[in-house]
């Protein structure tokens, strides 16, 4: 008789344990889904910020390029234009990485000047900030 009670109690304990494990798995999966959704939202916001920043940098680079384009250039300004072109290619490669890699393999010799900096971040941000600073300095000098 005691054997039946032992089997019944062990069966109840096993089923309660199975239910608790199942509930834990459900709560973990719900938590994972919520974390994944919040990560997607964060990535979406980050993507929008980066997209806006890329657009602003492209606009600034195009404006500087058009400023230097319509007048005679010195060797230093010519080097600046080459860097601007490299920056524009890098910004485009962020949007279309497959096409950019194809372009780079086709025109490798033309891109030697663009490869002055080793990392893309340095190639994009360093020259842009320098060019924007020098352009603003030149404008302030002309105004003042």
From Swiss-Prot:
Q: In which tissues is it expressed?
A: Expressed by the skin glands.
Ranges in a coiled coil = none
Residues found modified as Isoleucine amide: 143
Kindly give the InterPro entries that the UniProt entry links to this protein. Answer: Bombinin (IPR007962)
Q: Write down what this protein is called.
A: Maximins 3/H11 type 2
Q: Where is the signal peptide?
A: 1-18
Task: List cystine links.
Answer: none
Give the species this sequence originates from: Bombina maxima
A Pfam family matched in the record:
Bombinin
């Amino acid at each position: 008789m005691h054997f039946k009670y032992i089997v019944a109690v062990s069966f109840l304990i096993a089923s309660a344990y199975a239910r608790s494990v199942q509930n834990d798995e459900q709560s973990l999966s719900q938590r994972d889904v919520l974390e994944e959704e919040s990560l997607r939202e964060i990535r979406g916001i980050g993507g929008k910020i980066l997209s806006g920043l890329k657009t602003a940098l492209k606009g600034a680079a195009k404006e500087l390029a058009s400023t230097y384009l319509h007048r005679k250039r010195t060797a230093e300004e010519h080097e600046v234009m080459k860097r601007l072109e490299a920056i524009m290619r890098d910004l485009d490669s962020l949007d279309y990485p497959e096409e950019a890699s194809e372009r780079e393999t086709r025109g490798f010799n033309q891109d030697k000047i663009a490869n002055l900096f080793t990392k893309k971040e340095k190639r994009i941000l360093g020259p842009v900030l320098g060019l924007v600073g020098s352009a603003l300095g030149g404008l302030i000098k002309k105004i003042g």
